[in-house]
Amino acid sequence: MGPPVGVSMWPMLRNRHDVMMVVPAEGELRRYDVALYCRGEKYVLHRVVGHYVNGSEKGYVICGDNCVMLEYIPREDVLGILRGFYCDGRHIDCETSRGYHAYSKLWVALFPVRKMCKGANAAVRRAGKRVLVACGLRKRDAASKAGRK
């Protein structure tokens, strides 16, 4: 495969920079695996953070490393699994790299903290925009005008 497009797996995978190696998914994915699946017409590569059962449907709870929204993906929608990637010319093997395993476990464990920080960051940005608009230093954008009718 080629370089990732987007920032949902940052800081592990960098937009249009690193090169990924994805293989077909065989069997059950484990927690911390990075799954390739289809969302609409786009391919998405996100980390498995858990499993779910909904009646007869079984699947994975998935989230990007730079995301805070959990997704519930049925098993049959998973197309592949990340087996390794090249970062600045250095090969990282997702099966054997101790550093990769430590990063994966730490990143998933910090999910609640990351979610709280992203929420706080968004609130500070919104408040900052309101102050700039109130002081006349910035025009209110069309999206916020439409939401405040």
Q: Which ranges hold each PLM region?
A:
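Extended hydrophobic leader/signal-anchor segments used for secretion and membrane insertion
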Residues: 1-149
